[in-house]
Amino acid sequence: PGARADLRALQAAGVDAVMFGNENDRPYEFAVDTASTATMAYVVGRLRPEIAVPFGVDVLWDPMSTVALAAATGAAFVREIFTGSYASDMGPWTPDAGKALRTLQRYGRGDCAMLYNVSAEFADSLDRRPLPDRARSAVFSSIPDAV
């Protein structure tokens, strides 16, 4: 097992895209250690010649590391929580969608699709509007490519 075996199995099964993430990199951090992001970039770089479908990246809980990783690896998309305010077991969290989007553009990656998760796992939204209202608001105010 490992990233290469997973990639081969997913592509053999006919998936439309793959995503690389740090799902088991616990305990999670709001500002991920640079070594974690560098390691993810290394893994994607090693697998890049074998990737035959669009791929995305997600550094959980850290939108800025996510966009940096996308820029470094040539990812077609990112998925992360970029908007909202949350209470979590790690403390309060308020990502900055504008900063993430502008940083991605400064990296020359305006072509990288931004997929916004608007319902955080392991955290409670401090915004008490119903989820569909929060999603509509994110679409209007933060211009994601998809939610």
Question: Which stretches of residues belong to each language-model region?
Answer:
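Charged, often glycine-rich, active-site loop that binds/positions anionic groups
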Residues: 34
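Alpha/beta enzyme core
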Residues: 1-29, 38-53, 62-147
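Acidic carboxylate-rich catalytic motifs and surrounding loops in phosphoryl-/glycosyl-chemistry enzymes
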Residues: 59
